[in-house]
Amino acid sequence: MLFHFFLRCNLASLCIKIVNSVVVVGLYYGLLTTFSIGPSYFFLLRAQVMEEGTEKKVSATTGFITGQLIMFISIYYAPLHRALARPHTITVLALPYLFVYFIFYTDKRFMHPRKNAMLNTTTSMRNFSIQCVFLNNLIFQLFNHFILPSSMVARLVNIYMFRCNNKMLFVTSSFVGWLIGHILFWKWLGLVLVWIRQNRSIRIRPNKYIPFYKLIRLDKYLVSKWGDRIFYILVILIWFYLGGKIPAPLLSMKFDESTIQLEKGAKGKKKKRGKGEEEGDVEKEDEVGVGEKKGEIDESEEIRVNGELFKSLVAHFFVFDPNHFATLLFDPNRWNRPFRYIKNDRFDNAFRTEMSQYFFDTCPSAGKERISFTYPPSLSTFWEMIERRISLPTLDKFSSNELSNHWVYTNEQKSNNLKNEFVNRIEALDKESVSLNRLETTSRLCNDNTTKEYLPEPYDPFLNGPYRRTIKKTKSLSPEKTSGDNLETSRDNLETSRDNLETSRDNLETSRDNLETSRDNLIDKIGINRIHSILLPDIPDTDYQKLEDQFDKKQLSIEIVDLFTFAFISEFGKKKGPKSESNLISRDLLISRDLSVFSDEKEVRIEDGKGVIIDDEKGKKYFEYLENRIGTNTDDENIDKDSIAKIRKKVSRWIYNATSELDQAYGEDERKDPMDNEIRSRDAKRVIVVPKEKLERDDDDDEEEPTDIDKIIFPEHGDFRRDVIWGSIRAQRRKIVIWRTLQRYTHSPLFLDSLKDFRHYFVDFLLDILNIFEPIWRIIRNLRIFLIKLIRKRFALKILEHREEQQTHREEKKKRKKDEKNEKNAKNAEDPEREPRLWVSEFWTIIEYAQEVRGCVLLTHSFIRRNIVIPLLIIVKNIGRMLLFQRPELYEDFEDWQRESHVKCTYEGIPLSETDFPEDWLVEGIQIKILYPFRLKPWHVPGSDSDQNRKKAEEKGDFCFLTVYGTETNLPFGYSRLPPPTFESFFKPIFQELKKQMRNSKKNIWKLGKMLFQKVKGTKFLRKVAKKWVRKSIILGKKIIEGLKKIKELVKKERDPITSNQMIPESFTQISSPSSTNSEKKRNKMQDLTNRANKARNEIERIRKEKKKKKRSLKKTSSNAKRLQRIKDRLIRKLPVYLKLFIQRIYTGIFFSIINIRRMSQKFRNKFIPDQERKDILPFIYTINKIKESLYTNNSEENSHIFYDLSYLSQAYVFYKLSEIQLSNLDKFKSVLQYQGIPFFLRSEIKDSFKTQGIVHSKRLPSSEMNQWKNWLRGHSQYDLSKTRWSILIPQRWRNRVHRMVKRKNFNKRNLYEKYEKDQFIDSKKENICEVSNRNQKDDNFQKCCKYDLLSYKSIHSENKKDSRSLFDKLSFNSNTAFFDLLVDRARGMPIDINNLTGTGDIPYTEKTPDRKYLDWKMIHFDFIRNQLDIENWITIDVNRKDNRNQKTPIYTNNYLTNDHDTNFEIIYKIDKKTKKPILDLDFLRIPEKNPSNSSKGFLDWMGLNETQTHPVVLNKFNRLKMEANLFPEIVLFYNAYKTQPWLLSSKLLLLNLNNNENEINADNEKNEKKEAKKEAKKEAKKEAKKEEKQNIKKELTTKGDLENKGDLESVPSKEKNPSKDSKEKKDIQKDSAESTTKKVTSKELQKELDAFLQRYSGYLVKWNRRVDPDIVPKSEINWEVYSYLYRLFDDENPRNRKEIDPTHLVLSSAKRGELAFEILATRPIQSWKKLLLKRKELVFFEPIRLFGKNNGQFIMYQTIGISLVHNNKHEIQPRFRKKKKRYGSKTNFDESIPPHERITRNDERIPTNDEDEKRNKRLRINYERNADKNHLDLLVPENIFSFRRRRKLRILNCLNSKNRNDVDRNPVFCNEKNSSQDLDREKNLLMKLKFFLWPNYRLEDLACMNRYWFDTNNGSRFSMLRIRLYPRLKIR
């Protein structure tokens, strides 16, 4: 038994020894390293799987094992360990090799077999590919193992090797263990693969991958190709991963460091202080030069900017040290900076936290040499210097035994000393010594042992007691006088800087600099360490010998201390000046107090200006030694500053001051670069809070304005990046388990056992798990609280001790929570979505790059919503409406769509604009606010889209914000609106309408039933029959129900087998036996068996019957089934044909229904029109058509004058012809022809080829504008009409000659301005053609086309920049007359039909008015009142003409009255001598002749303003009214006057008072006012009474009238006055007006009647039929009584009047008497009136005209004329006058701009009354005559009227659209030679060119025509200056 026991003990011990042996441990760690998989396994796996042949596999395995063996050997062998076992060396080796490998194997040139044929040899070992496989596996095995799990397992071998003694055996065993593990791993992998191949179930399951697998097996090349690609991708990923482990030195941000160069003034020697070493200390030294008496600083600092470029670039990116090249790439600071930064608010730089004042070094400790961490670097450097410079025997290295012996000896000596001291103290106490100081015996510094003189107690370094104190920093003594002066000045500077420290920071910095310079000087003179000169390398040996001879080595330290003490005393005891007594006192005190070192025999004498004189011999020796050795030798520079810097070690600081983002944002950082911050601040947002007082404060308050509060808001979540330095490397904690955004105590689970208290880790983990189940939070809430309490009770520390404190703390917490809850509840009551919104906003800020992604998604959703989704919804909705035969609402929907605007907002929702983005929106975030979001409506109610509803919607704040999902929300980050508003707005009205219809249908059904019941109820027979049928039906229904119930019961009984097979029960009395109980049991069993058998039998029979039925059905098919099968087959065969036909049928049906929608809608409209109105409309339309047909026939029969000019074409036809023109890109041809390299003969050939091809019709190429219009027109389908439609628009003979220009030989533009006798346009054979026919020749009037537009002329005449004179081809003149077409725009050649002037044209077209020369009046709404004030304010006449003709010309102002100021119209008629009837006189178009001598007028005189024209005869008022009513009756007078004679308008009225002095005008006005003061005094009394009457009349008229307008009647008066009239001319005017009128009515009464009549009834335009006898036209005055009587007669309210009196007779009789003018008469919609006029003779017909609102007439008129007034040089200016009118604006006033409040007018005068007309006209005349001689009137510039924003856009558009006018096309049609004439437009005045370029004048009628065409409207509601093409006024060459 004992033997067995010992055996077991030996076995156990043996096992323990074996386990603890090096071999087993090595095998264990080797097995662990097999699980550390690195990138080399990829190469080995590739060789085993993909490579063919055993050679490559063997080479791969061999290389893999060899590499691992080298790694194990590197653990033991130091050189290999340094080369391979360091991470940075492995990284440096791995990255280049991986890159080369990737390039080499991906290039096909290297991998091609033919290319590698030279490298491959016969033997396998010499094969290059096999060698590459071996090297790859060998080298990649040396890399870091990072795949599974990490490199930690592989490094465990290195760690354990330090613990074992037999290292070689450990390495060998670990390698064997790794090899065994590697072999086992590959064998296991092979077995797994074999098992997968053999296991059929695993291979069969993925059936869907079988085809892919077969394809791979068939195509072996595909396998190798994709396998290589995958492998190369893995290689490049490994390369990136390894490269990501190290920071990039070239891309990291580096702090700015500047090298400073200091220059000395004395010797010119330079001393550089560059970048510091690893500690990074950089000091700027300012040295004070020697030899300056006044203490001036001679040194100058320079920043080295002009250094070498290469060195500066290298210094910017690298910290290069040639001695330490490894630190270049592997800096412990990770290239540039640490991880964190501790700020320092002082001036000094911050501390370096990762550096310590201690480091590792060897030192003797406890008798042995050990590594000590608490070893200061200054001591080590000092000791190294001593070892280098002093070869003492004590510095030899001792053995370990010697060190230990010395240590033991010193310790014994110390213990003995302590024992002795303790014994001495006890003995002193026993002796009862009085002196208690014996207990505190200390060693003191003694000067001499014999005298025993000690240093003072405060300065004794060995004294430890109450007298010990720190010595202040002092400055050493300089033996030279100059150095002493410098020290004195530096000390004075220091004192002054200390005094000014509190006042300014700059003084403090300068004082600190002075202190540093003085300190550096002391270092240079003496040195820091007191034995510094001994340790310097440049000290010769003779100095040491002298030192040994003169001094005793034992007292060296004491003597040096005395010397420094003396130097300190002498320095601070110096005298500044001879009269400073305070300095003497302080000096004496210092000497008496501090010079106790020396004996009484020593004499120290300090003389003024001579420094310190020492009489003692020892003192002299000290001084001489210091002067020779320790003093600074400026010639030799014996002091090594680098060694001093090493010795003077301080606390390590950063060489820079890093600033954070917040400091830089708030201006604390003085650097200018906004991106030059080094520290990451916490995520914050700056919010400016505006106080309510500032918003509610008025601007007029004098109180101080409250300032805005600048507040920084931090998110509630944590930010781990705060206070981290930019570019620093973070700690890669790959083993930390992170499961939440903010996690406390982040540690790896592997180190939980090392934590003191790791219970909180599990607590957090449990809490997080519980938080995951938020949906079931209510269920487990109690359980969670219980667990938390249990954990706290079990693991909390010191609960019992601090229970009371915790209780109070809990109460406080409860109160806080209650307060927080109350606050949250209050906030949630205001905004319930506040907390979720805050959470979502913070969530977007937490995630990295979330704001960038969110911003891009929002912009994408905004674009899709705006441009894709909404237009698609609109189109789908309108298509549905069209399919339902309803009118489409595209216009209304797109109008609502245009109102929606997307505004960019900040992250908080503050809107900015639609185009501007917030600053840093990609980083800080963005919101998109949708204003007036689009809501799709099923139909538009007419009143819903009114302005009032829109204003209500604006007041409600109809807006929303866009979410990431594309939905709408009320607030940023709020909940989405559900249901979507677009669908709700669309379907909700539909459902409501359906509900209404359903209700109505129910009501209708109920009513119908009720009606039927009432009808049936009326007959007794039917009532009886109905009762019988009801009774019978009820009885029959009951019987049917009862029968069904019986059938169900029978069926249930038959189905139940138990009830169906029941036996007949027998009585127990009949059967009786003793064993009755047994027999009953047997009977029951038998019954059950029989029941089961019967049930089984029945089931078998049922199944057999069903099978038979199925067989029969399969064999025999009925005829119906066969027929159905045949039909089905036939349908399947013909299905495609049916589908095609069905689709075509649907298509045609839809197409025709769409076409017929308009026709059907017209039918629907006609249904609602009463029959009576329809009958009345038809004859009216019939008469109009008949009149038109007669006109066409008359024109065709009688050779009417048809002008072949382009101006007579309609706009639609022009665009049609443009679309037919062959499109060709002529811009390239222009560039070809303009290229100078092409020979001249080739250019002509190219041009000829263009002509033959029909590309061009002229020698010059057309401009590209036509091509642009053609492209635009071809994209619009509304001009793609059929030929029949185009043939209706224009006669065929017009179209045949459109492409051809009118050929005219010897045409010259100059002839227009020369004598009229030489006019070449006159054709002698056709002189009489030009005469306009009289009233008998009305049917010969010209053909009129009123649908053309100026836009068409722009398109056609883009090539024709010259004037078109085709109108002159059909007109001729007398030799003494000159015809000038006023309505031709010479700049573009756009003549207008003369029918517009004569008023004898066709019926006016009211939808699109014919183009007029200067203005489109439909876009301006004038008031309808024709007051004399309004019209005379608008038009004034200058009659002061010296060149009046012999005829007496009556000139009138625009007025309806017959007073002195009669009306002047442009339509002037002569009385024919033969017929004595009025005919048209064209002399009014004659250009007036002017005298050159009288040409000194203002700027606008050249335009033809302010002059009168001579007219022979003016027709009577009725004829004029009739002629003018054909155009626009509401503004006919003014419009006609302006259209033909724009010079009738006063220039002063247009330009107002631009540059005149108001004082001069007022002075002249006063003179005139004095003369008329007497007249005005008489009229003042009458005026007041008349004003009240007028106001009452106007109120009555406005309330009763059909047109109630709210426009302002205020006009813009001006101080410019019209010129005065001569008295003779007044008399002529009065005579002519008396002759032209047959009736006279007083002006006041007639004015009132006219106003009332026009305001009441002017709603229709009345016209006469041309075929009516002209004798009916009255020539007398209007009888207003007849008008009123007719209106009363035809009123519906008085039917008796119509029956009693025949209205036809009354109308005809009044018209013949001249008492009725149909042109002014406007009828009310009365059927009888229409019947009267259209029943028989068709005398007149009515046309509705547009009713205009009452706007500010004068103001709009002034704007219109001011913009649209074209310079009339072609009307008035002759070539001979141009030389004298070179300047149109003065240079002095060129830069003068009109202020905004004076753009339109500078005067705010009240509107004068009718009685003030005469006075006002006189003022205007006087002012005009004064200003007529001045030549400094400024140009009329549209920018003066526009706002500043519109000015800028106007200039931009002008510059973009302006073209070079040099390449104007020339055509032989107009001229055969170059035209050398220079118009006024081409005046070579640089000032005018500049003005016309900056402020081009644009024509308002062009804009109006564009408006009419683009928007198909007649009003000016959509008129916009931004959507138009602006035309320049002048052609600047």
From Swiss-Prot:
It comes from Jasminum nudiflorum (Winter jasmine). It is a multi-pass membrane protein. One of its GO terms (cellular component) is chloroplast inner membrane. Belongs to the TIC214 family. It is found in: Plastid, Chloroplast inner membrane. InterPro entries: TIC214. Residues 488-514, 819-832, 1564-1642 have a biased composition (Basic and acidic residues). Residues 1105-1115 have a biased composition (Basic residues). The keyword Cell membrane does not apply. Residues 278-289 have a biased composition (Acidic residues). It comes from the Eukaryota. PANTHER family: PROTEIN TIC 214 (PTHR33163:SF40), PROTEIN TIC 214-RELATED (PTHR33163). The chain crosses the membrane at residues 18-38, 60-80, 87-107, 128-148, 176-196, 230-250, 1135-1155. Residues 476-487, 1066-1078 have a biased composition (Polar residues). Involved in protein precursor import into chloroplasts. May be part of an intermediate translocation complex acting as a protein-conducting channel at the inner envelope. The keyword Oxidoreductase does not apply. This is Protein TIC 214. GO terms for biological process: protein transport. Keywords: Chloroplast, Membrane, Plastid, Plastid inner membrane, Protein transport, Transmembrane, Transmembrane helix, Transport. Residues 266-291, 473-514, 808-832, 1066-1121, 1562-1642 are annotated as: Disordered. Part of the Tic complex.
